């Protein structure tokens, strides 16, 4: 355990895009902030498809969000492939082709870049440290250590300990299964809809030398078939060597209300901050993280 102080202005649980962005803007606003994450490195294990719009595409999708170039800083080392086209594949199988500017990320490198931005602003990180529970102003870790803060932010996804203990709404989380596969693939991202992934969708996102391929389903619509059955059928359409197997979930219940309870607030996937059309959450988490960080910094002042 590193030698680190125990009392902070703010503690962020979870160091992904939402958490690191929140911490960055709290620190830029003058707050002392600690980020606690159970992973090391942050960003691993991979749990998503890694696709984000470019900043230009985000300006088109979210015209009212200011200063996107300051917020969404993606270094070249974090970009696996640049995308120019999207194929939407309906049940008929005939793709609809659209222009789309996107980036397929190297997720660990992307999260490391966000950590560097937060640390440069003054945030500190405690990794490989799992939160047991949160009570009032105190965060209790599984190793027995305790940390206190005036504000505690839950940014640890749909299993965030603050969300689970204080927000008790029904959650619709779509389970997903995916692989990383080496090989040659088209340059367009593919989204498949219909019986291939009932209640969800399947994807193929090309990367440098391979692809991220997977799907998510609603189990209530799966007609007795398992997630693995659907995933195996879809993944078998592509030819290549599987180099990684992953799983996760997409929070599709919509934004949680309220986002704040007392000294606690939620951001990112923990708050249901995802695109309602497909559950994508990286850029939306960062937009929400900036707002949360700036509001918390103002409150602390």
Q: Which role does the model predict for each range below?
A:
Residues 1-10, 25-31, 211:
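Extreme N-terminal leader/targeting segments of oxidoreductases
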Residues 19-20:
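N-terminal Rossmann-fold NAD(P) dinucleotide-binding loop
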Residues 15, 29, 41, 113, ...:
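Predominantly flavin-linked oxidoreductase catalytic cores and closely associated redox partners
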Residues 260-277:
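Short FAD-binding loop at a beta-strand-to-alpha-helix junction that anchors the flavin cofactor
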Residues 291-301:
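Active-site-proximal substrate-binding core of FAD-dependent oxidoreductases
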Residues 11, 15, 27-48:
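Glycine-rich FAD pyrophosphate-binding loop
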Residues 87-106, 138, 207-219:
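Helix-loop-beta segment of a Rossmann-like dinucleotide-binding subdomain
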Residues 39-86:
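N-terminal FAD cofactor-binding segment of flavoenzymes
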């Amino acid at each position: 355990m590193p030698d680190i102080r125990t009392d902070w202005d703010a503690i962020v649980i979870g160091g992904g895009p939402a958490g690191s962005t929140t911490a960055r803007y709290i620190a830029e606003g003058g707050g002392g902030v600690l980020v606690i994450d159970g992973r090391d490195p942050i960003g691993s294990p991979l749990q998503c498809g890694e696709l984000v719009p470019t900043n230009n595409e985000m300006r088109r999708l979210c015209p009212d969000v200011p200063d996107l170039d300051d917020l969404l800083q993606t270094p070249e080392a974090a970009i696996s492939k640049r995308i120019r086209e999207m194929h939407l594949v309906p049940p008929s199988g005939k793709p609809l082709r659209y222009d789309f500017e996107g980036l397929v990320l190297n997720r660990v490198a992307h999260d490391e870049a966000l950590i560097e931005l937060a640390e440069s602003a003054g945030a500190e990180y405690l990794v490989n440290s799992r939160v047991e529970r949160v009570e009032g102003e105190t965060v209790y870790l599984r190793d027995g250590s305790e940390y206190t803060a005036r504000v505690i932010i839950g940014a640890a996804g749909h299993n965030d300990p603050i969300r689970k203990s204080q927000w008790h709404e029904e959650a619709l989380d779509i389970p997903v299964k995916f692989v990383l596969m080496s090989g040659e693939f088209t340059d367009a991202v593919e989204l498949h809809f219909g019986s291939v992934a009932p209640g969800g969708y399947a994807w193929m996102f090309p990367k440098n030398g391979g692809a991220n391929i997977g799907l998510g389903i609603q189990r209530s619509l799966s007609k007795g078939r398992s997630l693995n059955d659907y995933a195996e059928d879809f993944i078998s359409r592509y030819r290549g060597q599987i180099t990684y197997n992953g799983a996760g979930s997409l929070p599709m219940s919509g934004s949680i209300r309220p986002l704040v309870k007392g000294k606690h607030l939620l951001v990112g996937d923990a708050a249901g901050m995802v695109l309602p059309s497909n559950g994508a959450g990286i850029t939306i988490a960062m937009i929400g993280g900036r707002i949360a960080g700036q509001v918390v910094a103002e409150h602390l002042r």
